[in-house]
């Protein structure tokens, strides 16, 4: 009896809660670097994702990340750091990518981007993306030394190994040329 009464109470409370949940637009935002390493004078790709998890569309949505990447430290190769979307429907998402190029090396603090939107014509909301935090921008020379392909090492290895391999092959060919009859007699 207690269990059935408790179950009935739970069902009634759940139904009342579901019936009263009509949420306005609610934007979840993230900022994510797609490049593995930030290197001076090389492209660095960032992706912004906006997800409307509300029941209504978000109007006049803007992403503003101009303060994170000042033009004296970064070149904008492709994309914009200030983007405007007229509407993001309920239950949908939008992504935006930007390609920037760091001008200098060293530590850099990647701050959050500001996202503003309206749930209807009056309710103005401001939210922030996640913050990737502090990152390191490698020097081009240091990046090449650590991560670039080591073609010179392979070339040196080939120059060291080639004489012994080539010498063995030439000795085999001379030996084979001296005894052609032995090979023919064994095969017949």
Curated annotation (Swiss-Prot):
Cross-referenced InterPro entries: TRAP_beta
Keyword list, A-Z: Endoplasmic reticulum, Glycoprotein, Membrane, Signal, Transmembrane, Transmembrane helix
Cytoplasmic side: 173-188
Membrane topology: Single-pass type I membrane protein
Sequence ranges on the Lumenal membrane side: 16-151
Localization per record: Endoplasmic reticulum membrane
Positions of glycan attachment: 93, 109
GO CC, one annotated term: endoplasmic reticulum membrane
Transmembrane parts of this sequence: 152-172
Signal peptide region: 1-15
Family per record: Belongs to the TRAP-beta family.
Function field: TRAP proteins are part of a complex whose function is to bind calcium to the ER membrane and thereby regulate the retention of ER resident proteins.
Oligomer status and interactors: Heterotetramer of TRAP-alpha, TRAP-beta, TRAP-delta and TRAP-gamma.
Listed name of the protein: Translocon-associated protein subunit beta
Species this protein is from: Caenorhabditis elegans
Classification lineage: Eukaryota, Metazoa, Ecdysozoa, Nematoda, Chromadorea
């Amino acid at each position: 009896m207690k269990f059935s009464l408790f179950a009935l109470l739970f069902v009634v409370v759940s139904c009342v809660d579901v019936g009263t949940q009509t949420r306005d637009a609610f934007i979840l935002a993230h900022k994510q670097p797609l490049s593995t390493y930030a290197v001076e004078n090389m492209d660095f790709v960032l992706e912004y994702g906006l997800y409307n998890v509300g029941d209504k569309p978000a109007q006049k949505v803007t992403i503003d990340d101009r303060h994170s990447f000042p033009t004296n430290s970064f070149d904008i190769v492709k994309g914009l750091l200030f983007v405007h979307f007229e509407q993001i429907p309920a239950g949908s998402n939008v992504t935006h990518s930007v390609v920037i190029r760091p001008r200098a090396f060293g530590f850099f603090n990647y701050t959050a981007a500001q996202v503003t939107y309206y749930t209807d014509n009056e309710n103005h909301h401001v939210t922030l993306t996640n913050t990737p935090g502090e990152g390191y921008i490698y020097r081009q020379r240091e990046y090449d030394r650590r991560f670039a392909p080591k073609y010179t090492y392979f070339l040196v290895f080939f120059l060291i190994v080639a004489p012994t391999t080539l010498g063995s092959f030439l000795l085999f060919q001379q030996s084979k040329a001296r005894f052609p009859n032995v090979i023919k007699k064994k095969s017949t």
